[in-house]
């Protein structure tokens, strides 16, 4: 079973807070990383790296450029988890410990 939208948003909110100091309550699906959260490209790369580590996904640079909102990243992670449910389950177990 893939992570729920709320689980992914909560995980992203933690990463975003760690990288930028933005309060997790500000991280909602409709928020744009650049326009609403004022996240620069260097911080976005760090968020992407931590997201890859947390969810065991690979976000190619060309895909990263198209992920403009929190909701875009959530949908992207869910799509990757659906394509490889065994890896998603193993990662959830790893992070539950």
From Swiss-Prot:
Q: What's a BP term from Gene Ontology annotated to this protein?
A: lipid A biosynthetic process
Q: What UniProt keywords apply to this chain's record, in alphabetical order? A: Cytoplasm, Fatty acid biosynthesis, Fatty acid metabolism, Lipid biosynthesis, Lipid metabolism, Phosphopantetheine, Phosphoprotein
Cytoplasm recorded as keyword:
yes
Q: Which GO terms describe its cellular component?
A: cytosol; membrane
Gene3D superfamilies under this entry?
Answer: ACP-like
Give the source's domain of life in one word.
Bacteria
GO molecular function terms noted in the UniProt entry: acyl binding; acyl carrier activity
Q: Which residues belong to any copy of the Carrier domain?
A: 3-81
Q: Which InterPro entries match?
A: ACP, ACP-like_sf, Meromycolate-ACP, PP-bd_ACP
The positions making up the signal sequence are none
Keyword Lipid biosynthesis present in the record's keywords: the answer is yes
Q: Where in the cell is it found?
A: Cytoplasm
On modification after translation, the UniProt record reads:
4'-phosphopantetheine is transferred from CoA to a specific serine of apo-AcpM.
O-(pantetheine 4'-phosphoryl)serine sites (modified residues): 41
* Family the entry assigns: Belongs to the acyl carrier protein (ACP) family.
* PANTHER family according to UniProt: ACYL CARRIER PROTEIN, CARRIER DOMAIN-CONTAINING PROTEIN
Instruction: Give a short account of what the protein does.
Output: Acyl carrier protein involved in meromycolate extension.
This chain's protein is named Meromycolate extension acyl carrier protein
- This protein's encoding gene: acpM
